[in-house]
Amino acid sequence: MRVLISAVGDTDPFRNFHDGSLIHIARKYRPEKVILIFSEHTAKKQGNIEKALFSIAPNYEPELIIHDPIISDNEVHIFDVMFQRFSDILQEYYTKEDEFILNLSSATPQIKSALFVINRLNGINVKAVQVSSPEHASNENIGHDNDENIDELIEVNKDNKVNFIDRTIEDNAEKFSQALLKKTARDFIEKFDYKAALDILDQLSDFPNLKSVREEIRDVVNCLSKQDVPKGLRHKKLKEEEQKILSAYLTIELQRERGNVSESFIRIKNLTEFILEDYIEKRYPGLIDEYCEDIQKYYLSLFDYSKLLKATKEFKLKRTIAPIIDMNSSRNKVAHSLSPLDSDAVKQLGIAMKTLKTLVREQYHFSQSDFNFYHDLNKILLTKLN
């Protein structure tokens, strides 16, 4: 069965010697059932709507269902309320066995907008239809025929003929769907969730800049998964080792931005140990090897590096890394157990991140522009996705 669901608006049933949207859709598709949704304001039209529908053709007598309750005039101009109300109405009447048609052109702008969005977001199979004005332009200044005699309006209706001009437009949601996907991708980029953004972008139809955006994000995603250096960082005038250090630090920043606190804890200690090893090796060649032989260890912990800094009287650097050492017990708790993080541990992470940034900046003299790499990348990507 073909079923039309329609609100009733001021242009229904007729306006300016032509069908209103409701009657015109019924004329085109001839639904066997018409579900009518009235407001307090339009409820007085019920008799005229019924007469107009039955006038479409001599043998056309659709089943009419008047939805109850009538919508309050106080609510018809509130989008959120109309969105929920019409979502519920559609779910109430929808069946997979029937073919449903949704009128997108009757009633208040808020109701039409709500139906427009519902059509694109509900995920159920309905045919949504808009109706253009007979002039194919705004009918804002054209009066309503609400007070005219319905029988006379039917008689003079220019659409009331077999070869009427079809003004229906079936609403294909593809364009909106693409816009919604693009917005979702932008939201993921702003949250630094590049993998999720790429998954969305791979679903988009081609448009200018899409290919380059995909390539840039795919490079970042691949590098993050392999702990490699993104192409944008490789193009900076930095030594290979500096590129790796900066990339590792920025990866930790990304994890924190995305709320992955546990991963940030684990990575901070590893990067700090790498930086301290590099620092000591450059200034005190052979010291680490001697220390490892003495204690018979092949892997030095953060505590070991702290002892070496004390032995070499690198007290300033030892003080600099103190917050990271304090954080280490919380880090171990996360890494080696299922214990949740408490608020103090999260606070420690913020302090440790500032410490790590200071350490990285002082040891490798990176500029603020270097630290802004992903923020700047996001600006470029978002501009291309406008």
UniProtKB/Swiss-Prot annotation:
Residues 1-146 are annotated as: CARF domain. Pfam families: Cas_Csm6_CARF, Cas_Csm6_HEPN. Non-specific ssRNase activity is stimulated about 1000-fold by cyclic oligoadenylate (cOA), a second messenger produced by Cas10 of the ternary Csm effector complex in the presence of a cognate target RNA. One of its GO terms (molecular function) is nucleotide binding. It comes from the Bacteria. Residues 147-386 are annotated as: HEPN domain. The keyword Nucleotide-binding applies. GO terms for biological process: defense response to virus. The keyword Glycoprotein does not apply. Keywords: Antiviral defense, Endonuclease, Hydrolase, Nuclease, Nucleotide-binding, RNA-binding. Its EC number is 3.1.-.-. Encoded in a type III-A CRISPR locus. CRISPR (clustered regularly interspaced short palindromic repeat) is an adaptive immune system that provides protection against mobile genetic elements (viruses, transposable elements and conjugative plasmids). CRISPR clusters contain spacers, sequences complementary to antecedent mobile elements, and target invading nucleic acids. CRISPR clusters are transcribed and processed into CRISPR RNA (crRNA). The type III-A Csm complex binds crRNA and acts as a crRNA-guided RNase, DNase and cyclic oligoadenylate synthase; binding of target RNA cognate to the crRNA is required for all activities. Csm functions as a non-specific ssDNase. Base-pairing between crRNA and target RNA to form a ternary Csm complex activates a ssDNase activity; target RNA cleavage suppresses the ssDNase, a temporal control that prevents uncontrolled DNA degradation. Viral RNA transcripts probably tether the Csm complex to the viral genome, recruiting Cas10 ssDNA activity which is able to degrade DNA in the transcription bubble, spatially controlling the DNase activity. The N-terminal CRISPR-associated Rossman fold (CARF) probably binds the cA6 effector. ssRNase activity resides in the C-terminal HEPN domain. Belongs to the CRISPR-associated Csm6 family. Homodimer. The composite ssRNase active site is formed at the dimer interface. This is CRISPR system endoribonuclease Csm6'. It comes from Streptococcus thermophilus. The gene is csm6'.
